Regions:
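C-terminal effector/interaction modules appended to NTPase cores
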Residues: 1-100
């Protein structure tokens, strides 16, 4: 069974604004932060199919978010147009929007 995905646009905060210190790879399937919509539950996923080069703090990019815990986790909040926070632990490292 193939896992479901949503396409997201992510903008990382700069380190000075409380974001990451290093660039994140959105293409290799190794970056696994959480999404949170409007203060809701943390939603786990893995990012892939993003740009070949890692995305630097302060930059933005599109990638596919693989809903790795479905069906055990409900991802229904991730609908087209919804805005979200990108978290590493409790730290909000970026913002995003579901595109498809």
């Amino acid at each position: 069974m193939q896992q479901k995905t949503v396409t997201v646009q992510i903008r990382f905060k700069t380190e000075a604004d409380g974001g990451r210190a290093m660039a994140a790879s959105l293409c290799s399937g190794t970056y696994r932060p959480h999404f949170r919509v409007s203060g809701g539950e943390y939603l786990g996923f893995v990012l892939c199919n993003g740009p070949a080069d890692a995305v630097a703090p302060g930059a933005s990019a599109c990638a596919d978010a693989v809903l790795i815990y479905e069906p055990d986790v409900v991802y229904s909040a991730l609908t087209r147009g919804v805005e979200l926070n990108v978290l590493e632990g409790r730290q909000v490292v970026g913002t995003g929007k579901v595109l498809a």
